[in-house]
Amino acid sequence: MSIVDVRTPDPKRFIPGATGDWEVIIGMEVHAQVLSNSKLFSGASTEFGSEPNANVSLVDAAMPGMLPVINEECVKQAVRTGLGLKAKINNRSIFDRKNYFYPDLPQGYQISQYKDPIVGEGKIIISVGPDRQGHFEDVEIGIERLHLEQDAGKSMHDQHPAMSYVDLNRSGVALMEIVSKPDLRSSDEAKAYLTKLRSILRYLGTCDGNMDEGSMRADVNVSVRRPGEAFGTRCEIKNVNSIRFVGQAIEYEARRQIAILEDGGAIDQETRLFDPGKGETRSMRSKEDAHDYRYFPDPDLLPLEFDDAFVEALKAHLPELPDDKKERFVRDLGLSVYDASVLVSEKAIADYFEAVAAGRDGKTAANWVINDLLGALNKAGKPIEGTPVSPAQLGGIIDLIKDGTISGKLAKDLFEIVWNEGGDPAQIVESRGMKQVTDTGAIEKAVDEIIAANPDQVEKAKAKPSLAGWFVGQVMKATGGKANPQAVQALVKSKLGFEE
C-alpha cells in the first residue's frame, strides 16, 4: 500500500538542526481494549485486577481441540468505533493468524486481521494550540484502518530470582488496533490526537481509555526528513502508556534521528522502548515486516459478515460525540469555541456542565464549571467523578446570585463551604447570615462613613472619576462583601457627584 503525504510542510513545526531544518513524521497505532464483559473468542471475564490466571478459559490457554467463537458484542463495539471515526465499515472482514513466539502467547500465534479489517479509512479532527495570539488550529488526521485482535498475556520477571511467571488473564482480551496515517507533524499534534481519540472512545463507551491500567496503549512510528522530501526510515516506539510520555518519546526520538543523519549516518528500521525515568528511547529489536509474521486466514473462523441493517441499527443509537456537542454549545448556548472545547474534552465534564446549565444561562454555568470547579479539582488532584460539589449544588449557587440573594464575592465563599463541608447552598446562606445587604439605608450609611473618612481620596476621585472604584471596594470590605455591588456603585457615584 502506498503512503500519501497530504500535509503541506509548515515552518512552525520544523525542528532546527545544525545543518538546517527538519520535519518529523509521526504515525500512531493505538491498541484500545474493547469494553466487554468477556473476551474476543471465549467467555472468560475481562475484569481488571483479578488474581493471576483467574480469568483463563481453555480457549485462552490454547488447549488442544478448543475452537474460538466470536463475541458479537466486540464486533458491535468495533463498528460503533468505526462510525465514531467517520470511517468506512467493511461488511466482510477476515481473521488471520499472525505467527510469532512469545512465552505469554499460548497459541504460538495471535488472531488478528490483516488484509481485510472490519473498519477502513476514517478521520479525526484535532485542535492544536493556542499559538502566541491565542488561536487554535484544526488539523484533520487520517485513520488508515481499525481491526480486531487478541491481546497477549503478561510475563513477570520480578517475582522470583531464577524463574519468570506468566499471567494469562489478558490473553484473548479483545483489542481494537486503530492505525493512523502518517499525518502528524509534532509531539503536540500526537498528544492532541491521543487525547481526542480517547475522548471519542469514552463517549462511545467502547473503551475506557485508562492508560495506567493498560486498556489503551500507543505504538508510535517516528521518522524525520528535510521539509518536502520523501519519508525517511521510521522507528517504532512500543507500548507507551501515557500521553505525556508519548510527547517526550517523540521529542527525544526525533532529536536522536536528526543527530545521526547530520553526522552522516543512517537510521536503522527498528523497534524501540521508551524509558520514562531517563526520558530516552532505547533499541529493543530490529523492526519486522508483515511477511515476517506469515499471515494467513484462520481456518477455525469463518469470514465475519453482516449487512447494512446491522450497521444502521448501531448508528441510530450512537451518542452525541465531542465535535457535535461542541458545535451545539457554541450555537445554542453562545459559548466561545475555547470554552466549549474544554467542556467537551471529557464526557463526564460535559454531562456535569449540561446538568448545571439546564434552565440557566449557559455562559454563567460555563464560567463556574471551568474556572471554579475545574480549577478546584485540578488543585486537589481530583477527577470530575470525584467532585464534592454536585451539579445541583453548583446550580443552586448560581441561582442565589441571579435572584440577588448573594453577591459574586459571597458566592465564591459559598462555593468553598460547599466544597469542604457539603450542604444545601440556600440553607447555608440562611444559617450563616450570608445574604447580601440590599437595604439602601444601611448601604448609604456605609458609603457616607467611607467618604467622610477619606477626604483626600474624594478630591482625587473628583479629578479622576475612575478612582470611584476604590470607594466601592472599601464599602464592600466594610460590609464583609454583603452589600449589593450595584447599589454600592450607584450610591458612590451619586455621593461623589458623578453622573450615571
Swiss-Prot record:
Q: State the Gene Ontology terms under molecular function.
A: asparaginyl-tRNA synthase (glutamine-hydrolyzing) activity; ATP binding; glutaminyl-tRNA synthase (glutamine-hydrolyzing) activity
Sorted keywords for this record are: ATP-binding, Ligase, Nucleotide-binding, Protein biosynthesis
Give me the reactions it catalyses: L-glutamyl-tRNA(Gln) + L-glutamine + ATP + H2O = L-glutaminyl-tRNA(Gln) + L-glutamate + ADP + phosphate + H(+); L-aspartyl-tRNA(Asn) + L-glutamine + ATP + H2O = L-asparaginyl-tRNA(Asn) + L-glutamate + ADP + phosphate + 2 H(+)
Gene3D superfamilies recorded: 1.10.10.410, GatB domain, N-terminal subdomain
Ion transport as a keyword of this entry, yes or no, is no
**Would you say which domain of life the source belongs to?**
Bacteria
InterPro entries noted in UniProt: Asn/Gln-tRNA_amidoTrfase_suB/E (IPR017959), Asn/Gln-tRNA_Trfase_suB/E_cat (IPR006075), Asn/Gln_amidotransferase (IPR018027), Asn/Gln_tRNA_amidoTrase-B-like (IPR003789), GatB (IPR004413), GatB_C_1 (IPR042114), GatB_Yqey_C_2 (IPR023168), Gln-tRNA_amidoTrfase_suB_CS (IPR017958)
E.C. number: 6.3.5.-
Which PROSITE patterns does the record match to this protein?
GATB (PS01234)
What GO biological process terms are annotated to this protein in UniProt? Answer: glutaminyl-tRNAGln biosynthesis via transamidation; translation
Record keywords: Transmembrane included?
no
Enzyme class, top EC level, equals ligase
PANTHER family, per database record: GLUTAMYL-TRNA GLN AMIDOTRANSFERASE SUBUNIT B MITOCHONDRIAL AND PROKARYOTIC PET112-RELATED, GLUTAMYL-TRNA(GLN) AMIDOTRANSFERASE SUBUNIT B, MITOCHONDRIAL
> Which family is it part of?
Belongs to the GatB/GatE family. GatB subfamily.
Q: What does this protein do?
A: Allows the formation of correctly charged Asn-tRNA(Asn) or Gln-tRNA(Gln) through the transamidation of misacylated Asp-tRNA(Asn) or Glu-tRNA(Gln) in organisms which lack either or both of asparaginyl-tRNA or glutaminyl-tRNA synthetases. The reaction takes place in the presence of glutamine and ATP through an activated phospho-Asp-tRNA(Asn) or phospho-Glu-tRNA(Gln).
Indicate the quaternary assembly. Heterotrimer of A, B and C subunits.
Q: Write the protein's name.
A: Aspartyl/glutamyl-tRNA(Asn/Gln) amidotransferase subunit B
Write the gene name.
gatB
